[in-house]
Swiss-Prot record:
Organism classification: Archaea, Methanobacteriati, Methanobacteriota, Methanomada group, Methanococci
Taxonomic source organism: Methanocaldococcus jannaschii (strain ATCC 43067 / DSM 2661 / JAL-1 / JCM 10045 / NBRC 100440)
Role played: Part of a complex that catalyzes the reversible cleavage of acetyl-CoA, allowing autotrophic growth from CO(2). The alpha-epsilon subcomponent functions as a carbon monoxide dehydrogenase. The precise role of the epsilon subunit is unclear; it may have a stabilizing role within the alpha(2)epsilon(2) component and/or be involved in electron transfer to FAD during a potential FAD-mediated CO oxidation.
GO BP of this protein: methanogenesis, from acetate
Protein's name in the database: Acetyl-CoA decarbonylase/synthase complex subunit epsilon
Pfam family, one: CO_dh
Similarity-based family: Belongs to the CdhB family.
Amino acid sequence: MDERFIAYIPTAGSNVAHAEITSPTLVKMMIRRAKKPILILGENLEENEKELISKLIEKFNLKTIKTPEEMNLMAIMKYLASSDYDLALFTGITYYYLAQAATHLKQFSNVVTISIDKYYQPNTLYSFPNLSKEEYLDYLRKLLEG
């Protein structure tokens, strides 16, 4: 099996319903179709990644919550589960924290979850595959095209 499509931390997958691998093109379409998308932004991003994510926020006019700076991740999950957001994007969050938090959303809400991080996240509904730093930057650039 291709290592790009297995969990970065193999024990992070909580059940048999693992995330579908997605591409920047599909993520772009999902963001455009969403009525109320939100980006949950962690602190584990390098400077060049932050720059591209900032452009993404601006391009798609995404509401953003920074964790842990503005709100605790579990509080964000509870907030999203009871809110009217229909699409939640995640990036820069510590891998195993997001694995647990995304499980909460998967079980207790109708929010479509997408990990746009460089590591495959099995507990979201959609995820980028495991990517090298350069591939990840390329995926982010493709999100900004068009």
